[in-house]
């Protein structure tokens, strides 16, 4: 089957059709990885992945991580289920947040599998920080380029240099 790519916005995002994620060949993984690096966020519909297939796909991107605060599945600690019962009051990620941004080395990819999505109240947004930096006014860039930010979750410091180290990143000069 031919791989189809549908752009979802000007800044980032593409829907990919024509790849079966249940058993990804090296050739198809290289295509997926290239599309991820190009579009920053990619979506695949109707992919009935088992936990084993989910892990196998994720491992192609590199060593897997476990969440620092949320326990994963018993046999698959790298997989975190986000479930909310109808009577549950707490909201997962209700306020703006950035997943695992406290890591010293940025996470290359996250694979989300949606099983049942409520009709309202579960918006997930993505941002292209590379494009944000590229389009930032030069005066602001000059003012902040040597600054650092401290993420209060674990006190990890994030330097612009860390982004340059991210595997597969071709834009080494920011």
At which residue positions do the language-model features occur?
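Non-heme Fe(II) oxygenase catalytic core, chiefly the N-lobe of the double-stranded beta-helix
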Residues: 1-174
């Amino acid at each position: 089957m031919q791989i189809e790519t549908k752009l979802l916005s000007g800044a980032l995002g593409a829907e990919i059709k024509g790849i079966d994620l249940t058993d990804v060949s090296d050739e198809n993984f290289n295509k997926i990885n290239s599309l991820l690096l190009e579009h920053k966020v990619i979506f695949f519909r109707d992919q009935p992945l088992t936990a084993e297939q989910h892990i196998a796909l994720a491992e192609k991107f590199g060593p897997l991580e476990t969440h620092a605060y949320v326990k994963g599945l018993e046999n698959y600690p790298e997989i975190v289920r986000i479930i909310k019962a109808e009577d549950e009051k707490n909201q997962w990620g209700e306020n703006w947040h950035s997943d695992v941004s406290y890591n010293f080395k940025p996470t290359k990819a996250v694979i989300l599998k949606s099983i049942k999505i409520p009709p309202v109240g579960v918006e997930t947004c993505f941002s292209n920080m590379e494009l944000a930096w590229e389009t930032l006014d030069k005066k602001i860039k000059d003012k902040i380029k040597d600054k650092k930010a401290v993420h209060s979750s674990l006190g990890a410091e994030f330097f612009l240099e860390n982004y340059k180290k991210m595997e597969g990143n071709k834009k080494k000069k920011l």
